[in-house]
Amino acid sequence: MRLRLRLTAPLLAGLRLARLSVHLLHGMAVMALRFPSLNEAGRQARIGWWSAGVLRAMGVGLHITGTARPGATLLLVNHVSWLDIAALHAAVPHARFVSKADVLRWPLLGWLIRGAGTLFIERERKRDALRVVHAMADALRAGQTVAVFPEGTTGEGPELLPFHANLLQAAIATATPIQPVVLRFADPTHRFSPAVAYVGDTTLLQSLWRVATARGLEVHVTLLMSRGSAHADRRLLAESLRSLMAEHL
């Protein structure tokens, strides 16, 4: 007769957080020692492996539907948690994120996110958004894939916040296709899991603990069909894409 031991929530969380810490430290060593000698394909492979490892360390299952469009693409991604970057990079390791500069202060994670080629925006500086849009356009012209959170901040999860249409301008200016990506974190009953919500006054440590104690957590990454952006009205396009993404949450 085979016995199954069910760990208490604090013990489960402790084991997961210990695994995450080891994984992050290993990632830092790889980035410092191996990244300089790797070509672009090698770096992308490492980013994908590391991102999937973050999810595994925290006990989060990964399910990917659809494929990323090849070539220059702007990815629109709904924003729920600090886990979003790991989830998308596990599915699309070559994507360059646009993220708030606050993440640079996250222990270990911030340094690794910077090393993955992330573009940072300082939201307190009104003109910084224009600088980032120009940087996004340069990356798209170079044939890269850029990922943005059009909501601008994390939401509760089941419903989308209004989209900031100005983030689409880089794609419109360069006639780059836009591909919506929907992240859905679910519990064992397939309902949205509130454990991942990183909103309000929740601290990073509190969010880490909630995720670490959650059982049967899964993230579903759905890559929808891309859409052309040339000569589009950015506000109308943003609202249309928001409606499309809402249908898949």
Identify the residue ranges that each predicted region occupies.
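Catalytic-site beta-strand/loop segments enriched in glycine and acidic/polar residues
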Residues: A139-L168
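Catalytic core of membrane glycerolipid acyltransferases/transacylases, capturing the structured
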Residues: H26-L38, G42, R56-A57, P70-K126
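Residue-level preference for the first positions of well-ordered beta-strands
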Residues: A72-L74, T145-F149, P177
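C-terminal alpha-helix
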Residues: S243-H248
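A cross-family acyltransferase "interaction/gating" segment
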Residues: L108-W111, P158-A232, S240
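A transmembrane-helix-recognition feature enriched in membrane-embedded lipid enzymes
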Residues: R2-H63, W111-A116, A214
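A membrane-cytosol interface segment of integral membrane proteins
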Residues: L119-L140, T145
